[in-house]
């Protein structure tokens, strides 16, 4: 049985190339190509695809919006986000909504087909570069969250805040209006 697919990308040549690749494998029926999120929703309703390959940064209704709608309505559709660049925030949002795959447009053909096969076998596929970027971002934010002050550091911070005069836009360093602060 062939897998039904919808391709969503505002770059027609790219979308047609993906269509040709999928058809050449003999395992897919491309039910349609959409150039916008709104058009994608119409194709989903009409064709009930098993897989959507979607550019994560399409127009007015974004790839994330499409993903949310599909997940909220519990549609049994696999979703592969494809992007020309790594956007950590979009990747994290997509992962939070259980995207099935994230891949870059400059990936090799074998990586692209591996991503699709992994997804169709109920595995998640995340391109290694995207995974590294997300992990680096999360490690940085985790370090910020874990920072705690000692009792003494807290006391010093409170003293500093208490003794700091309010900022006025007319008072700049060197204007002769600075005050000495005694600790």
Language model features with spans:
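Active-site beta3 strand of CheY-like receiver
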Residues: 47-54, 58
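Acidic catalytic/metal-coordinating carboxylates
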Residues: 36, 62-65
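Short, flexible helix-to-coil linker/hinge segments that flank and couple to helix-turn-helix
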Residues: 91-95, 100-147, 151, 155
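Short hydrophobic/Thr-rich beta-strand motif most characteristic of the beta2 strand and flanking loop
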Residues: 27-35, 43
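Recognition helix of helix-turn-helix DNA-binding domains
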Residues: 163-183
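Conserved acidic segment of CheY-like receiver
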Residues: 2-14, 18-22, 52, 149
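Short amphipathic alpha-helix used as the core "switch/output" element in two-component signaling
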Residues: 64-75
């Amino acid at each position: 049985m062939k897998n039904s697919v919808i391709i969503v990308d505002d770059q027609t040549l790219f979308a047609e190339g993906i269509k040709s690749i999928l058809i050449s494998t003999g395992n897919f029926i491309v039910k349609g190509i959409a150039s916008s999120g709104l058009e994608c929703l119409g194709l989903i309703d009409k064709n009930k695809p098993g897989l959507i390959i979607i550019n994560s940064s399409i127009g007015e209704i974004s790839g994330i919006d499409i993903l949310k709608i599909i997940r909220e309505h519990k549609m049994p559709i696999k979703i592969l986000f494809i992007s020309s660049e790594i956007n950590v925030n979009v990747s994290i949002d997509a992962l939070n909504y259980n995207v099935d795959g994230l891949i870059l447009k400059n990936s090799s053909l074998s990586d692209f087909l591996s991503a699709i096969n992994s997804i169709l076998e109920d595995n998640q596929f995340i391109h290694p570069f995207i995974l590294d970027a997300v992990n680096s971002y999360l490690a940085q934010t985790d370090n910020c969250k874990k920072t705690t002050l000692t009792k003494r550091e807290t006391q010093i911070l409170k003293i500093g805040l208490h003794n700091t005069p309010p900022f006025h836009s007319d008072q700049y360093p060197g204007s002769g209006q600075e005050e000495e602060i005694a600790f």
